Amino acid sequence: MENLIDFSDPILRLVLPILLKDQTTGKNIIWATDPPPKVDCGPMGEITMEQLDRIRLMPRVQKRLSEQKKRTKGKAEVFTPLWVVKKMADHAEQELNKGDWEQFVHERCLEIACGEAPFLTSRYDPTTGEPVAIPDRVGILDRKLRAIQENANHKFQWKALVLSAYQSVYGYEYQGDNLLLARVNLFLTFTENWIEKLGLPISTSWAIAVATRISWNIWQMDGLKDTVPGTDTLCLIFDWEENKEVTFRQIKEESDNV
């Protein structure tokens, strides 16, 4: 099975400090699970670049079967087959896409307890580990990017709409290693689409802009309390339309009152 995520990739390493950041605390995201033995810290310890240089952080499908079973038993961690992801994402797209492709790109959506974020981007099959070609990906972000690929008239429009697509997708996850994998998957989806569409080296400024949006929109949270795991601190997210920080709980309460 090929390496699905290469943490030595220069453009990924450039933005890793951003992808590791918890925008609520201003620190790095925490493990919030039992870290690998080589890490030498507890569940409340931050995930750092130095740790990632010592271990091989990999998607669930590439872990030993015994480790997968341990996570399923201890953390209720299960991953959805790609065909199920597709059927559910088909339904979500029907709700979001009313025929105006550009409006579809801007429609906001949230993947709860997102794990490695397969409902946003399906870079690989969660159960087999097989890479999925860009035209065959089924996540909601994948579909937004495909709409942009098919309809954007020039590269400037393409870039602006891709940024809007990333501003429109949200997800939260408790366990820090899964959260980082989700963030990295979204970032690599950007770089892969950039190369496919533009055929140019990745722009540093655009890579940073996309990574910043990912670090705000895909965040670490205890979904039962709306807080940073192990604390009473309410999680912040960013409302890109209003250009301001808000608590996730505030968004929930406003939605309940609609």
What is the predicted function of each stretch?
Residues 229-231:
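Short conserved micro-motifs at the rims of enzyme active sites and ligand-binding pockets
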Residues 80-81, 175, 247:
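Helix N-cap and loop-to-helix transition residues
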Residues 1-79, 83, 91, 99-104:
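A short N-terminal interaction module
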